[in-house]
Amino acid sequence: MKEYLIRRALQLIPVLILVSLFSYFIITLAPGSPADMYITDEMTEEQERQVYIDMGLDKSIPEQYLAWVKKVLQGDLGKSLYTNHQITEEIDGKLENTILLMGAAFIFALLVAVPVGLICGMKKGSAFDQFVCGLTHVFISVPGFWLAIMLILLFSLKLGWLPTSGMHSLNNDSVIDLIKHMIMPVIVLSLENIATFIKYVRSNTISQMEEEYVMTAESKGCSGRQILFGHVMKNTLLPIITLAGMRLASLVVGSFIVESVFGWPGLGRMGMTAINNRDYPLIMAYTMLSCIVLIVGNFIADILYAAADPRVKKSMLSALDEGGK
């Protein structure tokens, strides 16, 4: 198993290289130049040329990419073009804030979706099931940006129950204050995942309820509760680990919008600011960090799935043995 984990980890390296290549060339080919921020109308052609040389923009794009990779491997992500601060300083604390928000949204989505999905699956065709199915379509269709604005208008500006933006109120670092700031961003960020998880759990529950082992348990006089918690739930919820890894992408994309609307000091807001300012080094850092979060999240999901299901673990080891022959 250890050898498999090492091999899986090594497989992530080509993915990171491809993402960095694609991102760098897309950013480089975008209209404008990073040097535009430093060039003024009063500069001579020679001074403008010197700006390009100082920024390494006089070299070809492949040479610029290799120079960037060399710096990254040395732990130097460069400087922000807008603030002139080291990018490591710019992202300090922001990754943790984004992970906190995404983690809270993910846990909230599971806490809501799993019991609701199980009930819908057990009571297929009931009024509750039909209502929830309709609601999931609404959750998936509602634009996150619009919902965020509506929540701010209602709960912050009209009712005054929740703060409009930020992570903490002025001179208040309490956990309660943090939770108040998280409520609306978490709701917006988790809504689509709640709908997706409900549909997935419901579908799996219905499928499991039609299996022979359920009919056997019913014939032996087992109650619905015993069947659900003793047999159906485990088989229903196990595949959700894989789905959870796949849904990380929606959280990363969602955080980009949610953090910008609610002023949450995380990577998403930093990425939006970097794009608005055409801060290319910071955009590159945001892209790579987002990619790493996705890759690591999916890697952890694979490991958890293998640990939870012995059959998957066995197939992984078999694949590894065949690959080594």
Indicate where each model-derived feature is located.
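Alpha-helical transmembrane segments of integral membrane proteins
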Residues: 2-3, 95-128, 144, 173-325
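An internal, D/E-rich "acidic patch" concept
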Residues: 58-114
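Membrane-water interface segments at the C-terminal ends of transmembrane alpha-helices
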Residues: 23-29, 70, 134-165, 188-192
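Hydrophobic alpha-helical transmembrane segments of membrane transport/permease proteins
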Residues: 15-66, 159-178
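Membrane-interfacial helix-loop-helix junctions in multi-pass membrane proteins
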Residues: 53-61, 78-87, 169-182, 275-281
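Short hydrophobic, aromatic-rich alpha-helical segments embedded in or entering the lipid bilayer
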Residues: 43-75, 183, 262-273
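N-terminal signal-anchor/signal peptide hydrophobic helix marking the start
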Residues: 6-16
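Residue-level signal for discrete positions within transmembrane alpha-helices
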Residues: 12, 94, 98, 134-137, ...
